[in-house]
Amino acid sequence: MKYCLPCLTVAALAGSLQLVAAGEITGKITLKGTPKPELEIPLTPSCGKINPNKVTTRHYVVDKDGGLANVFVYLKDAKAAPATGEGPVLDQKGCMYEPYILGVVTGQKFKVKNSDPELHNVHPTPKLNKEFNLGQIPNGPDITRSFDQAEVLVRIKCDVHPWMFAYMGVVDHPYFAITDKEGNFKIAGVPDGKYTIVAYHLKAHGANPGVTQTLEVKGSAKQDFTVEIPAAP
């Protein structure tokens, strides 16, 4: 069965819903279309000394088989549940935020590190949560914060270095994942039931809600998606 949304394609292939192991949803996100080349980012002289590598935008990170990284995948209608384990860590390293995409549960504390010998500032610009803007000295103490409202995605920037961005998915349960460099994802510990699963890619979907598909978990399930590059205006 195939569902088409504006600029998006969901591929729900026959047999893509499979029982595997208890409590997991696994899948793969692939990109349809050829993205434009990433743009090179000119660094300041001080950042160029810290990071001598070529730095580019990260709009579409795709492997040789079309696997799409940095997709935030989550259950839209899962019941609220507390976080399991420690919250994520966002690092400023080589004058870049790492990782580019990360996720957190509402109320869960996350940390921001500065591993650079360079002043940065951490400036999330949420629409539903409380904004903050804090300087962080070179190799200084971690910043620890949390967000109280579900929001996909919260932009985090550095006003000192305008090319530095990261994006955080905030949901009220731990049933989410970010695709790896091959486009694979795994959501663990999911209770049995029917869900709407969402795959959201920042560049492809923008203000759109992402690609959605319904699935039923009985022990575990598999769900693949295809994300289509939007047509040029």
Which residues are covered by each model-predicted region?
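Bacterial N-terminal signal peptides that target proteins for export
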Residues: 1-8
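Hydrophobic helical h-region of N-terminal Sec-dependent signal peptides
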Residues: 9-13
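C-terminal segment of classical bacterial N-terminal signal peptides
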Residues: 14-20
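Extracytoplasmic copper-binding redox domains, predominantly the cupredoxin/blue-copper superfamily
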Residues: 20-233
